[in-house]
């Protein structure tokens, strides 16, 4: 179980075959095509044309259609364990079906746009109705604004304008003008103004002093009542069109699975087009290079031998090492740690795969913190059901829960915990004289000190393991002096300190081993430095080494703390249920409380376990910065593709 060895593959093929090559590579899913160095390209080569923009546009169109269906015709909610539908690779790559699904998406988007347009039209028509209703009593055509001798003007006054004052001002100052109040509410007063043409301007000027505003009905023809009738007809027609569009959209509600399949097909096509841009061509040939796992190379090479192409395989050079993609290989136990490692950072290609070393510690610590047979059984059964029924594409997280569930059950058996003290409390409710208790090796509540010491010992073991891995890696890379003075020196110092405390290994009262470690520390901390830098180097090495080592060890006290808190909470919920004196109520309260405790502990143990790995363990040896292996393959989010062997 280690980082998969990669080979660099360089291919030169005929341009007419490049599409078939890309499709077969996508089927095989074992080659990551590298991005070409465009600055070093000769003038005769260029990138292959790719339809990425078209794929992205279609993907957006499809996503809009799916969002519309989920909003307007939501499908039945799928169960938690409902698996993705399976589809053969041949059907998955059916271009005719893809075209039909894209037409369906376009139709859905058109209907959605029609509904939005008609909704906006309804809003506009209702707004026009609201503006015309105050003028309903006006029986004069709105296009009639003047006669031979008179001007006809409509307008509004603010609600605070006193109508009697307006009429009085007109009568006293402009007797050739007459105003009629048609409607009044809290927002406005609507009026009709009749004036002799010679005094129209003066009358309007007078009314403006009261806040008059005109022009609300400008551009309309017919009476307000006729306009309102026409608006009612338009609203009914718009509502009918909108309902027809809604029904047509609802009829397409069962197309969501087809659109989801289409989305997956487009994702695979987009990935193929993005990789097509990495191919170089001069119009006659195409050239590309990439990375392939060494174990997959024979099958890929056998297929390349059947083509009219030339290819070359080589190991990555020292200059290429930082750019080599990383793929982790593990067994059924260690691959469950992939979800943990990927959250931190992929290891460098020339680093070490942490999963085989981390897996025992992570699972052991998780089980120790949870430590309950009931919780362990729930984790085991839940993860197995999810893996079997759901068939997730990424299984590592649920596999991790499964292994942690087994260890949780084991520690629960050691501590005698089954949903806390559920069984003893239940037995006491049935028979108050009951003394039933599950057998246990130790009790988290009564053996706190022993558990704390055990946590520190386990922390020391993991920290020393990380240091040992660092020593091996440094020696393998030819950096033995670094291993000697950075890790082995501290082993000697710690061993010498322990021997001195036990009174072992001293000569004439002098702790020899401790003194040897001290000399090595003084020499190693000052190596490569001159003058006063040696002094500061020694001081920094001693301070950082002592504080760093012991603070890392102390961090493992959280193992005891999480175990204790989980056990206490479980017992508290059981105690609350037992106070009712009713078995049914006790079971309900206990199960609800323990469910909450399980959820809380799952999150807490997961986070704290990761923290121990990332900070205390990885900090000792881990070299990160790797780039995950991303081969050209068929991507799917909604369906499960059943691979078929090509002849």
Language model features with spans:
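Conserved, carboxylate-rich catalytic/transport cores that coordinate ions
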Residues: 2-7, 19-22, 26-33, 278, ...
């Amino acid at each position: 179980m280690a980082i998969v060895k990669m080979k660099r593959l360089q291919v030169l093929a005929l341009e007419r075959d490049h599409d078939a090559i890309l499709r077969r590579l996508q089927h095989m899913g074992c080659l990551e095509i590298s991005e070409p160095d465009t600055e070093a390209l000769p003038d005769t080569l260029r990138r292959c044309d790719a339809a990425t923009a078209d794929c992205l546009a279609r993907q957006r169109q499809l996503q809009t259609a799916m969002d519309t269906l989920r909003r307007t015709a939501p499908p039945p909610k799928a169960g938690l364990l409902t698996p993705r539908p399976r589809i053969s690779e041949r059907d998955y790559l059916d271009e005719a079906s893809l075209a039909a699904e894209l037409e369906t998406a376009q139709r859905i988007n058109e209907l959605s746009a029609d509904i939005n347009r008609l909704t906006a039209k309804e809003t506009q028509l209702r707004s026009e109705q609201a503006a015309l209703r105050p003028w309903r009593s006006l029986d004069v055509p709105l296009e009639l604004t003047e006669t031979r001798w008179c001007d006809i003007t409509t307008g509004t006054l603010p609600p605070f304008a006193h109508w009697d004052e307006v009429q009085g001002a007109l009568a006293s100052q402009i007797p050739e003008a007459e105003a009629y109040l048609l409607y009044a509410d809290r927002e406005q007063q609507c009026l009709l103004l009749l004036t002799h043409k010679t005094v129209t301007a003066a009358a309007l000027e007078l009314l403006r002093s009261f806040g008059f505003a005109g022009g609300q009905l400008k551009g309309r023809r017919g009476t307000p009542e006729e306009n309102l009738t026409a608006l009612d007809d338009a609203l009914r027609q718009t509502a009918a069109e909108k309902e027809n569009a809604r029904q047509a959209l609802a009829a397409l509600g069962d197309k969501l699975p087809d659109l989801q399949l289409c989305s997956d097909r487009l994702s695979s096509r987009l990935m193929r087009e993005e990789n097509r841009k990495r191919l170089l061509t001069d119009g006659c040939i195409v050239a590309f290079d990439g990375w392939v796992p060494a174990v997959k190379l024979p099958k890929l090479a056998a297929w390349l031998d059947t083509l009219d192409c030339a290819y070359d395989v080589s190991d990555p050079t020292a200059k290429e090492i930082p750019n080599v993609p990383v793929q982790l290989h593990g067994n059924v136990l260690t691959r469950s740690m992939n979800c943990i490692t990927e959250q931190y950072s992929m290891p460098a290609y020339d680093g070490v795969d942490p999963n085989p070393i981390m897996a025992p510690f992570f699972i052991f610590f998780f089980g120790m913190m949870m430590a309950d047979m009931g919780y362990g059984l729930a984790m085991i059964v839940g993860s197995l059901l999810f893996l079997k029924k759901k068939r997730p594409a990424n299984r590592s997280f649920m596999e991790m829960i499964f292994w942690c569930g087994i260890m949780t059950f084991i520690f629960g058996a050691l501590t005698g915990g089954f949903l806390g003290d559920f069984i003893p409390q239940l037995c006491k409710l049935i028979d108050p004289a009951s003394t039933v208790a599950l057998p246990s090796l130790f009790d988290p509540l009564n053996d706190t000190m022993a558990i704390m010491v055990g946590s520190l010992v386990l922390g020391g073991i993991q920290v020393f393991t990380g240091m040992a891995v660092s020593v091996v890696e440094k020696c393998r890379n030819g950096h033995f002096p670094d291993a000697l003075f950075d890790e082995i020196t501290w082993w000697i110092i710690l061993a010498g300190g322990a021997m001195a405390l036990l009174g072992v290994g001293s000569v004439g009262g002098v702790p020899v081993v401790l003194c040897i470690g001290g000399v090595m520390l003084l020499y190693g901390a000052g190596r490569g430095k001159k003058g006063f830098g040696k002094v500061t180097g020694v001081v920094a090495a001693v301070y950082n080494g002592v504080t760093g080592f012991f603070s890392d060890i102390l961090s493992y006290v959280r193992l005891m703390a999480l175990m204790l808190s989980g056990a206490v909470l479980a017992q508290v919920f059981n105690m609350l249920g037992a106070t009712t004196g009713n078995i049914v109520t006790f079971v309900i309260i206990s199960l609800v409380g323990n469910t909450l405790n399980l959820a809380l502990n799952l999150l807490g143990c997961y986070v704290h376990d990761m923290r121990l790995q990332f900070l205390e363990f990885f900090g000792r040896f881990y070299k990160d910065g790797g780039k995950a292996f991303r081969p050209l393959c068929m991507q799917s989010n909604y369906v499960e593709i059943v691979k078929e062997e090509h002849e």
